[in-house]
Regions:
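A glycine-centered beta-loop-beta connector
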Residues: 32, 40-57, 101, 109-126
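The conserved cystathionine-beta-synthase
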Residues: 19-36, 43, 88-105, 112, ...
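Tandem CBS (Bateman) regulatory domains
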Residues: 1-15, 54-87, 93-103, 118-142
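Short, charge-rich amphipathic segments
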Residues: 27-38, 56-64
Length: 142
């Protein structure tokens, strides 16, 4: 059975890529491509998470106008991000967070301090590393 005392603080990304809700979607797309990530946390002016923008959200933003041949001007992140966003704190248990992310089909969760300010992010990849690092007595590598 898993040793379940591993906490989010041990595996969170401490400097996640961020965008503002009022940012141009193409600026967010550049961030996603340049950092080779599948999405970003969207924050307000106080670094409080207000949404998540995924690659699929970005595709939807691009296709929503171009498919119909519409001139859209500036497409804002806030119009396509997933919101509201569920956040977690640094002391939450890795296994509990992994189960919640799986149940809600989410690839990332913002980590906030006691005032709701973003201090990090946990991703599915980070959770996989955490679970790999746990003691699994019956598992033999192949």
């Amino acid at each position: 059975m898993f040793r379940t005392s591993v906490r989010i603080r041990d595996y969170m990304i401490r400097r996640p890529v961020l965008v503002r809700a009022d940012s141009d979607i193409f600026d967010a797309i550049r961030q996603i491509i340049n950092h080779r990530i599948s999405g970003v946390t969207v924050v307000d002016e106080h670094r409080k998470p207000v949404g998540i923008l995924s690659e699929l959200d970005c595709l939807g933003a691009i296709l929503s106008g171009s498919y119909y041949g519409e001139e859209q001007g500036v497409i804002k992140v806030e119009d396509f991000m997933t919101s509201p966003v569920e956040t977690i704190n640094v002391d939450e248990n890795i296994i509990d967070v992994a189960k919640s992310m799986l149940d809600h089909k989410r690839r990332r969760r913002p980590v906030v301090d006691e005032n709701g300010h973003l201090i990090g992010q946990v991703t599915c990849r980070a959770l996989l590393k955490a679970i790999r690092d746990l003691d699994i007595p019956d598992h033999k590598p192949t």
